Amino acid sequence: MASRYEKEDSKRRILSACVQLFLEKGYQKTTTVEILKKAGVTPSTFYNIYHTKGSILTELTEFMFGNQFNISGKIVGEETNPVLLYAVETCLQLTLAELNENLREIYVEAYTVPENIELIHKKTAVQLQKIFVPYLPGYSASDFYE
């Protein structure tokens, strides 16, 4: 049985390989065989960790949406107006999607998978509540989600 360290290392290598392959070839054109080869893992290791290529996309989506507001905050400054922060975050997403056709495809894939849409909406709703609560007191994250 693989140790926790080995599993985490395999997971990191799979994610790294996927990011590189998805950006180079696109999500749809990247095969599981290519991921296995680039990551240097066996099929059983891959399927034990991720089960499908789609589950990797979900994890990458979660990472991206978990960090996008932090990155935007670093760009404009942590103490900036929250509405400006939201505008910068939105512009950052649009710019990234326009920079590279394969990156745009990743965004489209992420936004069309029901599991990912749910994740995106919930994470965005929490951030929108933080940003707009001064203007809409009494609103909760679910008010921005539902």
Language model: regions and residue ranges:
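Long, acidic, intrinsically disordered low-complexity segments
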Residues: 31, 41-44, 98-111
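Short, Lys/Arg-enriched anionic-surface-contact patches
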Residues: 5-10
